From Swiss-Prot:
InterPro entries: SecB, SecB-like_sf. This is Protein-export protein SecB. Residues 1-22 are annotated as: Disordered. PANTHER family: PROTEIN-EXPORT PROTEIN SECB, PTHR36918. HAMAP family: SecB. Residues 8-22 have a biased composition (Low complexity).
Length: 177
């Protein structure tokens, strides 16, 4: 018999045998996923083909947001991706793809102090393969080779955001350590 529940997470007693066995198991269910906003701009088609050699440089920016929904145990998570490509030789824009992708999740059994990181790491991680496919399809349909995004480290992204917020709250005259 397996120590995993339907969501693939190990049962609490398997994770920490010394913990209280009465702690509820984590339950995560994707209720729906959707494109909230999508934009693709092909600068090459608008301005004409660039002269000389084209060496694309691609940058990807990711931001996340989560909020509680009125229904019990339901949360909406929005991941925003901005994929911008420019010519490395003259910095002229090639394309811009912006995607806001959302999901509504049913989450139970996550302690309150761990809920925010859970929503900002695990939920976007589950949605990422769909985001990656949409961006790949959009770049291909926009007249460019398909762009397959590298996996995003949502743990590192979360830590960076927490560090940024902590830094923003620190008074300007207070030393860093």
């Amino acid at each position: 018999m397996s120590d995993e529940n339907n969501s693939g997470a190990a049962a609490p007693e398997a994770q920490n045998p010394g913990q209280n066995a009465a702690q509820p198991a984590v339950r995560l269910q994707i209720l729906t996923q959707y494109i909230r906003d999508l934009s693709f701009e092909n600068a090459v088609a608008q301005k004409g083909l660039p002269s000389g050699e084209v060496q694309p440089e691609i940058s990807v920016q990711v931001s996340l947001d989560a909020r509680k929904r009125p229904a019990e145990h339901q949360y909406e998570v929005i991941s925003k991706f901005r994929v911008q490509s420019s010519n490395a030789t003259d910095k002229s824009p090639l394309f811009l793809c912006e995607l806001d992708y959302g999901g509504i999740f049913h989450v139970e059994g996550v302690p309150e102090d761990q809920l925010h990181p859970f929503l900002m790491i695990e939920c976007p991680r589950m949605m990422f393969p769909f985001v990656r496919r949409i961006v790949s399809d959009m770049t291909r349909d926009g007249g460019f080779p398909p762009f397959n995004m590298d996996p995003v480290d949502f743990v590192a992204l979360y830590r960076q955001e927490i560090a940024r917020r902590t830094q923003a709250q620190r008074p300007a005259d207070q030393p860093l350590s």
